[in-house]
């Protein structure tokens, strides 16, 4: 695949602790499209140091709307969709060069390694995500606190990894998780139980999910082998599920605050 046919697309909001490391792995790109949600830290200053970057300002409403606005700004056949803390490995970049997508392939999934303070963990709960896709066959839709990419066509699987390496302070993570879990709770409450996945059915039980995720991360995913970093990650995931449980309990006691809309 000719790398000039790929445009990286990134969403940003106060991502100064992460941006440089992400952009340094995108120097091969002829153009990088960034949709910024009115950052107030050094994000825009960092972006200005990279001549390939073209930044568009858009007030954030939903993840899907933000991503779809970004799709409209891309003029190449392929889009590489990245969060500001997603760092491409050299192996994945080399893999792009040798891709020869058949016409029925509309996108490719990539696997992730979650990093704690810069070190990749052996096992995490991050699922593969479709990050490389044809612009003409793709659109985003909202799904809970995040978004889903709908692609018209078949998908392939990349061998290389992306490192999810967020260096923003814990206070920012806590703020984001609370916002996410408010939205996630509304999604769980508004979706009929029969339509929920097994994981979401467990989450809807409130008290069970936090302990399930702790055991899953430490034992089944091998977090204990990562030492204190593995424990840190497992506690993060447990805390996020505890937040969700608290919001679900609050909804039971005060349902008027969780009406659809």
Task: Say what each PLM segment does.
Residues 9-28:
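Short, well-formed alpha-helical segments that are part of the catalytic scaffolds
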Residues 65-71, 89-255, 261:
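Catalytic-site signature of metal-activated, phosphate-bearing donor transferases
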Residues 44-75:
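Conserved donor nucleotide-binding strand/loop of the catalytic core
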Residues 17-20, 41-49, 91-92:
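Acidic helix N-cap motif at the loop->helix transition within catalytic regions
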Residues 25, 36-45, 49, 60, ...:
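A conserved acidic beta->alpha catalytic loop
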Residues 79:
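Short aromatic/hydrophobic "clamp" motif used to bind/position activated sugar donors
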Residues 5-7:
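Cell-envelope/extracellular polymer assembly enzymes that use nucleotide-activated donors
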């Amino acid at each position: 695949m000719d790398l000039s046919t790929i445009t990286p697309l990134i969403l940003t909001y106060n991502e100064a602790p992460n941006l440089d490391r992400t952009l340094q792995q995108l120097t091969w790109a002829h153009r990088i499209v960034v949709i910024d949600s009115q950052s107030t830290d050094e994000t825009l200053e960092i972006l200005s140091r990279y001549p390939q970057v073209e930044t568009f300002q858009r007030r954030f409403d939903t993840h899907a709307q933000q991503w779809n606005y970004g799709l409209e700004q891309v003029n190449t056949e392929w889009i590489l969709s990245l969060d500001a803390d997603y760092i491409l490995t050299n192996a994945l970049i080399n893999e792009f060069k040798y891709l020869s997508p058949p016409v029925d392939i509309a996108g490719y999934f990539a696997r992730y390694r979650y990093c704690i303070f810069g070190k990749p963990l052996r096992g995490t709960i991050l699922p593969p995500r479709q990050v490389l896709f044809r612009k003409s066959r793709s659109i985003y839709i909202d799904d809970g606190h995040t978004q889903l990419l709908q692609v018209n066509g078949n998908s392939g699987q990349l061998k290389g990894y992306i490192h999810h390496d967020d260096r923003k302070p814990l206070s920012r993570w806590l703020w984001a998780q609370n916002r996410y879990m408010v939205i996630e709770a509304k999604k769980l409450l508004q979706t009929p139980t029969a339509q929920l996945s097994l994981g979401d059915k467990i989450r809807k039980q409130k008290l069970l999910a936090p302990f399930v995720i702790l055991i899953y991360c430490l034992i089944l995913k091998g977090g204990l082998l990562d030492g204190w970093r593995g424990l840190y990650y497992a506690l993060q995931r447990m805390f996020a599920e505890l937040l969700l449980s608290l919001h679900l309990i609050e909804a039971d006691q005060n349902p008027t605050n969780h009406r659809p809309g």
